[in-house]
Structures are given as structure tokens and as C-alpha cells.
Amino acid sequence: MASVNKVILVGNLGADPEVRYMPSGDAVANLRIATTDRYKDKQSGEMKEATEWHRVSMFGKLAEIAGQYLRKGSSVYIEGRIRTRKWQDQSGQDKYSTEIVADQMQMLGGRGGASDGDSDSGTDRSASQQSPASAQRSAPTGQRQPPARRQPAQPPSNGFGDFNEDIPFARPAALDGIPFRNDGAPRY
């Protein structure tokens, strides 16, 4: 039977990305991403939060983009896979480290993440390890320039108008900014 190793995270960076370059010249970025679950405590009735921290690694152009555009507090969508590495510490003890190896990323919120107040919601800010052509960004010299704005696509006219507002499986507004295929289905 086939197996699946797929991770999807939507969270915030706990620190600026750490970007290094391998001898081959390829970039490697390490990120710490926090995800927070909110739940109601059955005993007290209070809303509580549980935060999980995730180590995320990126390679190549995706790592360069993360290093250039992400900052502490940036909200980000990540797709990737779980990888566990085994290594030995100075005393020879075996240690294990579990991380997510990202192959897709989309920056959420305004340009520059939580540190900038300006919103740039009409801009395509997604990058993919699998399709380098879509991840290509012109490298500005000296100063960052905002990407060109895209015009929103007009929905096809099917004669139902805004009928989908009442459909229970319509895409929730909370998922705005998360990459979907052209037909509206999520990329799983």
C-alpha cells in the first residue's frame, strides 16, 4: 500500500530565517514556525491556547526567497514533508531531530509579514521548490520593489450570481491566501 508524508502548516515565524550557502552555492534556510490551537477548557470554560514550534528547512530558490522576504512575525503557509535526522553529540550519544522539509511556501498577510503595516493582498507571493519557474523573482539591486499587481480574475458567469454564499462546503474566508488550484480545489 502507498504511503503519504505530507505536512501543511499555517503559522508565524518566531525569528528571522537563518540562511546559509552550501559549497555548491545552493541556499539553505532554517525557520522556526509557531502554530497555535485554541480550545475551550471543559473544567473552567475558559479559552486556552496551545502553541507548537516547528523546525522548517528550505533549499535552493525557495530558501533565498524566504531569506529575502520573511521576518520574525511573518505569517506563512508551508507545504512539505517530515524528516527525522540522526546525529551524535560531542559525548557520542545518538540524538534525533525532526523537521519539516518545505517544498512550497506562500507568504500571508501584508508584504514583509507582521512587521510591515501595509497590506498587499492582491500580490502573488507564493513560491514552490518543485516549479522553479514560478518561484523566480527578479533580484532587485539595492532596494526592494513591490511585485506587480494582478487584476482579480472574473468568475465565470453560470447564472447563479452569489448563490455559493449559502453552500456549506464553500471555501471559508479564513483560507484566503492559501494556494488552491485553478478549479478552486486545494493542492493536496
UniProtKB/Swiss-Prot annotation:
Give GO terms: molecular function aspect only: single-stranded DNA binding
Give the UniProt keywords, A-Z.
Answer: DNA-binding, Plasmid
Domain (SSB): give its ranges: 4-109
What sections of the sequence does the record tag as coiled-coil? none
- State whether keyword Transport applies: no
Q: Where is the composition biased (Low complexity)?
A: 124-152
Which Gene Ontology CC terms are recorded?
A: nucleoid
Q: Which InterPro entries match?
A: NA-bd_OB-fold, Primosome_PriB/ssb, ssDNA-bd
Region described as Disordered: 108-188
How does this chain assemble? Homotetramer.
Protein name from the UniProt record: Single-stranded DNA-binding protein
